[in-house]
Curated annotation (Swiss-Prot):
Protein name listed in UniProt: Ribulose bisphosphate carboxylase large chain
Active-site residues, Swiss-Prot/TrEMBL: 174, 293
EC number: 4.1.1.39
Broad enzyme group: lyase
MF (Gene Ontology): magnesium ion binding; monooxygenase activity; ribulose-bisphosphate carboxylase activity
Function: RuBisCO catalyzes two reactions: the carboxylation of D-ribulose 1,5-bisphosphate, the primary event in carbon dioxide fixation, as well as the oxidative fragmentation of the pentose substrate in the photorespiration process. Both reactions occur simultaneously and in competition at the same active site.
PROSITE patterns linked: RUBISCO_LARGE (PS00157)
Subunit record text: Heterohexadecamer of 8 large chains and 8 small chains; disulfide-linked. The disulfide link is formed within the large subunit homodimers.
PANTHER family, per the entry: RIBULOSE BISPHOSPHATE CARBOXYLASE (PTHR42704), RIBULOSE BISPHOSPHATE CARBOXYLASE LARGE CHAIN (PTHR42704:SF17)
Subcellular location: Carboxysome
Species, as recorded: Gloeobacter violaceus (strain ATCC 29082 / PCC 7421)
Cofactor: Mg(2+)
GO biological process: photorespiration; reductive pentose-phosphate cycle
Length: 474
């Protein structure tokens, strides 16, 4: 009898069996319809890696700690997860990548919540494992097609706001907490009239005593209308609809719709995938863009031996739904290597991405024509970073300068103008064939000669750098 199969006909025998007898199947060839997962496994001393990998496959699918008589009431060989390959992690002791295949029928259609409940559930507390990290998931086309995905996507967003050929510019309003609704709206107006495309609620802003959500929405929409009238451009502000209950979240979204705002916002990890998918479907029905913030992600993804890599959270967001998501900047104050960051940025934006371990992509992923998500670069960036940001992210991104706009010595509007001039100069230089990375300083200095706003920003931030080594490196 093959130990890689569960044979009910062999008869029920109580007791505890090694997981590897049933769930380690190195001869298995994954099917096109399987959900594939790559786990970084660190077993406890004395636990063979084959047993550890099989335990992950078992505990995240059909297994439990002992043999149960109800195993004989179903065809476990059809439903079990299979650890089909194990590779050592280069440069690391006692760490392996275990590849596990899950049958499609284990997962509810259109539910990111259900996928994560299985794959990153109780197995992460398993005593036989010292640490466990989900590095990547391959979602088969058969499952991808059960999700709506982004409410609109990159192409439709550009058509809605009538802006092409460059990244979009944004700004998070600061201070993040404490402003009254009227002063908050004034800050939004100054940024938008100065040249930004979007402004943003900080993720912390919901409906606090100093600024209730309804008041904020009203003053912000007034700022949008005024700035559009002055500039002739379509403007927007990410109104954060995240709330304590789904009912309150939807009430805020409905009010934003009444105001005819073009875009709203949700904190998808703290708010939860069920709430996020609900909001994304509503946004498509109502023609409103959805900006996604990733507050809480570093708690989950920053440690390289335990947790969930952000590329998994990014893929799950594309399925759940969002038109923008924060991805880090590579050059700013937040964690992120270039190769790894661009790996998950491509997974957000492209229709088809090939396996590429040099960028942390463990599986080829086909999105079956699902719309792409705009990457948002935000966190500790200023005008001197503009050439690098354009070189790294290209056009389909939102470059979001909070302190890099509001910290301008002349105020918000000049800060916005400085960023817009720097961006337009970099786009022009790129289109002329200049090397953005090699000529970065020259490009910015040339533009600053005829823009006093940019010159002042360049002088203020000329010494500001964030040169720390990334914690989570490939």
């Amino acid at each position: 009898m093959s130990y890689t199969k569960t044979q009910a006909k062999a008869g029920y025998q109580a007791g505890v069996k090694d997981y590897r007898l049933t769930y380690y199947t190195p001869d298995y060839t994954p099917k096109d319809t399987d959900v594939l997962a790559a786990f970084r496994v660190t077993p406890q001393p004395g636990v063979p890696i084959e047993e550890a990998g099989a335990a992950v496959a078992a505990e995240s699918s059909t297994g439990t700690w002992t043999t149960v008589w109800t195993d004989g009431l179903t065809e476990l060989d059809r439903y079990k997860g299979r650890c089909y390959d194990i590779e050592p992690v280069p440069g690391e002791d006692n760490q392996w990548i275990c590849y596990i295949a899950y049958p499609l029928d284990l997962f509810e259609e259109g539910s990111v919540t259900n996928v994560l409940t299985s794959l990153v559930g109780n197995v992460f507390g398993f005593k036989a494992l010292r640490a466990l990290r989900l590095e990547d998931i391959r979602f088969p086309i058969a499952l991808v097609k059960t999700y709506q995905g982004p409410p609109h996507g990159i192409v439709v967003e550009r058509d809605k706001i009538n802006k092409y050929g460059r990244p979009l510019l944004g700004c998070t309003i600061k201070p993040k907490l404490g402003l009254s609704a009227k002063n908050y709206g004034r800050a939004v107006y100054e940024c938008l009239r100065g040249g930004l495309d979007f402004t943003k609620d900080d993720e912390n802003i919901n409906s606090q005593p100093f600024m209730r959500w309804r008041d904020r929405f009203l003053f912000v929409q007034d700022a949008i209308v005024k700035s559009q009238a002055e500039t002739g451009e379509i403007k927007g502000h990410y109104l954060n609809c995240t709330a304590g209950t789904c009912e309150e979240m939807m009430e805020r979204a409905e009010f934003a719709k009444e105001l005819k705002t073009p875009i709203i916002m949700h904190d998808y990890l703290t708010g939860g995938f069920t709430a996020n998918t609900t909001l994304a479907k509503w946004c498509r029905r109502n023609g409103i863009l959805l900006h996604i913030h990733r507050a809480m992600h570093a708690v989950i993804d920053r440690q390289k031996n335990h947790g969930i890599h952000f590329r998994v959270l990014a893929k799950c967001l594309r399925l759940s739904g969002g038109d923008h998501i924060h991805t880090g900047t590579v050059v700013g104050k937040l964690e992120g290597e270039r190769a790894s960051t661009m790996g998950f940025v491509d997974l957000l934006r492209e229709e088809h991405v090939e396996r590429d371990l040099s960028r942390g992509i463990y599986f080829t992923q086909d999105w079956a024509s699902m719309p792409g998500v705009m990457a948002v670069a935000s966190g500790g960036i200023h005008v001197w970073h503009m050439p690098a940001l354009l070189d790294i992210f290209g056009d389909d991104a939102v470059l979001q300068f909070g302190g890099g706009t509001l910290g301008h010595p002349w105020g918000n509007a000049p800060g916005a103008t400085a960023n817009r001039v720097a961006l337009e100069a970099c786009v022009k230089a790129r289109n002329e064939g200049r090397d953005l990375m090699r000529e970065a300083g020259d490009i910015i200095r040339e533009a600053a000669r005829w823009s006093p706003e940019l010159a002042a920003a360049c002088e203020l931030w000329k010494e500001i750098k964030f040169e720390y080594e990334a914690v989570d490196k490939l």
